[in-house]
Amino acid sequence: IRNTPKKDNRVVFIGNSITEGWDWHYPEYFKKKGYINRGISGQTTPQMLVRFRSDVIDLKPDVVVILAGINDIAENTGPSSIKTITDNIISMSQLAISNNIKVIISSIIPARDFPWRPAIDPRYKILKANSILRSYALKNNLVYLDYFSKMHDGNNGLIKQYGIDSVHPN
């Protein structure tokens, strides 16, 4: 894909297992649309920021969709503050903008708990991070894709029928 010539209206999706899973479940959808999936399971925002140039900018897309932050909150690579999470997502968006790539920032999807980290309650951090990301997007005239408000169960967890577990939507 890195050597693929630029197609009209190309969109890159960058994220974690949630993004990666879209390609598993709907591979033809991505191929038909010319979408490029750059989701890597388990990744945190610092890891995505490191690969942002090669996985997004070098592909010269028209649009990037950023869905990130849940694995930071799950402490996959150690504790992470809300500021660090949102700063990394904002840095990715600034890199895209400086390369004339339109940015769509996705909310962090609701989660009540993490099957792999049962001691962590992510709900407060998700709400706070989403508030910061929404404000940043609005202030900078970016699209904010609000999955959270449509997918939470009233207790800030993922609606059961929307997920294969408490984190990953189906």
What are these regions (language model features)?
Residues 17-21, 41-45, 70-75, 109-113, ...:
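Solvent-exposed loop/turn segments at secondary-structure junctions
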Residues 42-50, 79-89:
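Glycine-rich anion/phosphate-binding loops
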Residues 51-55, 85-92, 122-125, 129-133:
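A general structural detector for well-ordered alpha-helical segments in enzyme core domains, enriched
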Residues 67-73, 92-126, 151:
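Active-site segments of SGNH/GDSL-like serine hydrolases
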Residues 82-106, 134-142:
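Charged, glycine-enriched surface loops/patches
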Residues 109-170:
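Catalytic His-Asp segment of secreted/periplasmic serine-dependent ester chemistry enzymes
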Residues 1-65:
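Serine-esterase "nucleophile elbow" of acetyl-processing enzymes
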